UniProtKB/Swiss-Prot annotation:
Keyword RNA-binding included in the entry's annotation: no
Species of the source: Cyriopagopus hainanus
UniProt note: domains: The presence of a 'disulfide through disulfide knot' structurally defines this protein as a knottin.
A single MF term (Gene Ontology): toxin activity
Entry protein name: Hainantoxin-XVII
Signal peptide (residue range): 1-40
């Protein structure tokens, strides 16, 4: 009985490292899948918030449904109130300029 108990604790460091790496990799994949599923279920959520905010903003009373500087643009036909829509290589497009 003691040999069985002792052998359980005599695992090689390589096996332990592989198990930890596998656990971390699977955890990352699980979190990434949750993020992708959430984005797929709520597409354009941020753009809708911009439109709703602009509808209540007296500064944009003439130019409704437009994005202010540093807000996302060019998705779902959202144009910039002032300035131009800049799209970096990675990430979302945003309004630049005053």
């Amino acid at each position: 009985m003691t040999t069985v108990g002792v052998s359980l604790f005599r695992r090689s460091p390589e096996k332990i490292t592989m198990k930890i790496a596998t656990f971390l990799g699977l955890s990352f994949l699980l979190i990434a899948s949750y993020v992708l599923i959430c984005e797929a279920q709520h597409p354009g959520f941020q753009e809708l918030l911009i439109l709703e905010e602009n509808m209540r903003d007296p500064e944009n009373s003439k130019e409704r449904s437009c994005a202010k500087p540093r807000e996302n643009c060019n998705r779902m036909n959202i144009l910039c109130c002032r300035g131009e829509c800049v799209c970096p290589t990675f990430g979302d497009c945003f309004c630049y300029g005053d």
